[in-house]
Amino acid sequence: MPMTNLLLLIVPILIAMAFLMLTERKILGYMQLRKGPNIVGPYGLLQPFADAMKLFTKEPLKPSTSTITLYITAPTLALTIALLLWTPLPMPNPLVNLNLGLLFILATSSLAVYSILWSGWASNSNYALIGALRAVAQTISYEVTLAIILLSTLLMSGSFNLSTLVTTQEHLWLILPTWPLAMMWFISTLAETNRTPFDLTEGESELVSGFNIEYAAGPFALFFMAEYMNIIMMNTLTATIFLGATYNTHSPELYTTYFVTKALLLTSLFLWIRTAYPRFRYDQLMHLLWKNFLPLTLASLMWYISMPTTISSIPPQT
């Protein structure tokens, strides 16, 4: 039974990831006044499967100067972590109901840095190494604000459990009282997933493709799959934390429908930002975090800690 549950979680994620790639290419096409993929299958719907077939049947070339063990391990680790992050998410019931679900997500997403670092270093290429170092600095930096924003929201729910967060928002979405935090969270998730305007790691004009430049065929596809799964996961987490839907025990399907709709709308916002915004300069990226986001999130954390004390109560406890 646990194996069936695992497959029922993984297969829809893989399908969603495949069609997210197609949707992105279609949106990019229409925004640039062209069609996008429209040859394979009706309206190009089978394009992701054709791409997968092509990539996984090609020979995975390895640079002769690369460190083979890490070079092969890195993409596998990236995909494993991307799938592992989904286990505590309530949709409406999580695969594993962890008491410290949010802490687990934060800790596991930090491990994704290693796959990027290994791939950049093991490729033995200057472009890959510079891309990897940028990605690591960016990811570690933005995780600081993500953690502080999470702490602020947890002070309102009183638990690290994601299901409790959903219960907290039965009467009011957390995005309304904490909209500055929600805005900073959304921008930080863009940086965390290395998306435009923070895709410095894959700056085509500077680094060709970034940390995955030496990868081809299957391993290259694994990196792409991990990236798009992380995008969907981050938006799903955003929907859970700030746009929690009321869970009705009589109709769990309704919860799932609302929940997925919110996650899809947030994901489409990611794609729209990709088409509309130019890339940040690296110093601007770090300036935004350390000089703007960090002081603001720390100030808001102090506010959410002091408020219950000021009104002679304690934070909610569950």
UniProtKB/Swiss-Prot annotation:
HAMAP family per UniProt: NDH1_NuoH (MF_01350)
Q: Which InterPro entries match?
A: NADH_UbQ_OxRdtase_su1/FPO, NADH_UbQ_OxRdtase_su1_CS
| Encoding gene per record | MT-ND1
- UniProt record, GO biological process: aerobic respiration; mitochondrial electron transport, NADH to ubiquinone; mitochondrial respiratory chain complex I assembly
GO CC terms on record?
mitochondrial inner membrane; respiratory chain complex I
Q: What does the UniProt record say this protein does?
A: Core subunit of the mitochondrial membrane respiratory chain NADH dehydrogenase (Complex I) which catalyzes electron transfer from NADH through the respiratory chain, using ubiquinone as an electron acceptor. Essential for the catalytic activity and assembly of complex I.
Which compartment or compartments is the protein found in?
Mitochondrion inner membrane
Any idea of its EC number?
A: 7.1.1.2
Q: Which reaction(s) does the protein catalyse, per the Swiss-Prot or TrEMBL entry? A: a ubiquinone + NADH + 5 H(+)(in) = a ubiquinol + NAD(+) + 4 H(+)(out)
Q: What is its main location?
A: mitochondrion
Please identify the protein, giving its name as recorded.
NADH-ubiquinone oxidoreductase chain 1
- Write out the transmembrane intervals: 2-22, 68-88, 100-120, 146-166, 171-191, 213-233, 253-273, 285-305
**Stated family:** Belongs to the complex I subunit 1 family.
Query: Which Gene Ontology molecular function entries are recorded, alphabetically?
Result: NADH dehydrogenase (ubiquinone) activity
Q: Which organism is it from?
A: Pan troglodytes
The chain's disulfide connectivity reads none
Q: What class of enzyme is it?
A: translocase
Assembly, per entry: Core subunit of respiratory chain NADH dehydrogenase (Complex I) which is composed of 45 different subunits.
The membrane topology of this protein is: Multi-pass membrane protein
Going by the UniProt record, its keywords in alphabetical order are:
Electron transport, Membrane, Mitochondrion, Mitochondrion inner membrane, NAD, Respiratory chain, Translocase, Transmembrane, Transmembrane helix, Transport, Ubiquinone
A Pfam family (short name) is: NADHdh
Specify the domain of life of the species encoding this protein: Eukaryota
